[in-house]
Design a protein with these regions (language model features):
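Catalytic adenosine-cofactor/nucleotide-binding cores of aminoacyl-tRNA synthetases and other
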Residues: 57-201, 256-283
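Active-site cores that bind ATP or allylic diphosphates and position pyrophosphate for catalysis
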Residues: 1-66, 72-78, 86
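C-terminal accessory/binding modules appended to enzymatic or scaffolding proteins
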Residues: 207-255
Length: 283
């Protein structure tokens, strides 16, 4: 609460007749029938002025709340001149809208920040009484991690309109299941499309010719599904006696050119038999 004696008289109108922030803000709130106002703690003194203006205009006073400042990991405040710390730039980097809303809504509150993929869930979770009076500490690393975990929750319907630029055989639920656990930002699907489309020379990875010949020989007929991988690798194992890393690593390198990555059982259905044979260097 404020004692009016401790407040100076606010300037409402400049000498040239133009209006300052206070009066237009209150009138706008009245016209728009605003019932709740949440703003930074640097506006607490302004709130005292605005309540007096609401009273003077004989209007209902909204419910006011003030959230604490955002500070960096060293405990320093952010300047408005730090352009990189803006919603616009976060979105340019690839952060999902719901990630940003989730993080900044619950940072500095007693509520745990956990990945959420649905706006209704966020609304139901939010309770303004959980917001701390202490400054909220921003961590870019935590925000990045939250975005990665949020993408894991997305089903294909939630992202399909965002990947229509990919080749037709990658605009599938199987592709999304293949990459979703291995990306931090959605735009990384573009890199995985290139990885999967590339035909790698298995000789660059010192893979034995006989192994590749057997892999091609026992490759099941298409169409492929998520069970094809197990059937194929089981057949290769029976022919070669290889198992574990000795069995799976050569196939991963041939198919993706990378020593690690998503589950390959989701990769196989993205191709027909000729596509896999091409990667094996047999076409």
């Amino acid at each position: 609460s404020f004692d009016p004696k401790n407040l100076s008289d606010p300037v409402l109108i400049r000498e040239d007749g133009t209006l300052l922030y206070h009066l237009p803000s209150v009138i706008d709130d009245i016209e728009e029938k605003i019932t709740h106002i949440i703003r930074g703690e640097d506006h607490i003194a302004n709130t005292a002025y605005h309540i007096q203006i609401f009273n003077a205009l004989e209007s209902n006073i909204p419910i006011f709340a003030h959230h604490p400042f955002l500070i960096d990991e060293e405990g320093k405040g952010f300047s408005k001149r730090v352009g990189s710390l803006s919603i616009e730039n976060f979105k340019k980097e690839g952060f999902e809208n719901i990630t940003l809303l989730n993080y900044f809504l619950f940072i500095g509150s007693s509520s745990n920040i956990e990945p959420i993929d649905d706006l209704t869930k966020i609304i139901n979770k939010f309770d303004i009484s959980n917001i701390s009076q202490s400054s909220a500490k921003f961590s870019k690393e935590s925000l990045v991690s939250l975005n990665k975990d949020t993408l894991k929750l997305f089903n294909f319907d939630q992202i399909k309109d965002k990947i229509i630029h990919l080749q037709n055989n990658f605009q599938k639920e199987t592709f999304w299941r293949f990459v979703k656990n291995n990306i931090t930002f959605l735009h990384e699907v573009n890199s995985w499309e290139k990885v999967i489309s590339n035909v790698n020379n298995y000789k660059d990875f010192n893979i034995d010719n006989a192994f590749v010949d057997i892999a091609a020989e026992v490759l099941p007929n298409d169409p492929f599904d998520e069970n094809t991988w197990d059937i194929w690798t089981s057949s290769i194992k029976d022919k070669t006696g290889f198992k574990g890393k000795d069995l799976f690593m050569p196939l991963r390198l041939i198919l993706t050119g990378k020593p690690n990555g998503p589950e390959l059982k989701y990769l196989i259905p993205l191709f027909d038999k000729n596509g896999i044979l091409q990667k094996l260097g047999k076409i």
